[in-house]
Amino acid sequence: SMNRILPNGCLALVDPCTEVERDGLPYAVCVNGYDATIKRVRKLNNGFVLEPDSTDPTYQSKVFNFNEPDTMAITIIGRVVFYVLPTDWEF
């Protein structure tokens, strides 16, 4: 879901932080305490938008508005600052 900036299978280096310091940058986030993902994150007044950066149009942004009672919890793990490709990755 992030193949425009992070090739599939790459290893991401995450700088730990607990807040979104700059809107639109890629962050590692945990959704509902279980699922971890990397997405571009934008802050809302009371929530977040997780945006894919993909060539595949089936990946869509997800809005997490904490004013709505059934919204899943979002935990910011950190900002993605670098990535590397595995040694067995083929071009």
Where are the regions a protein language model picked out?
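Acidic/glycine-rich C-terminal interaction modules and beta/coil loop segments
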Residues: 1-91
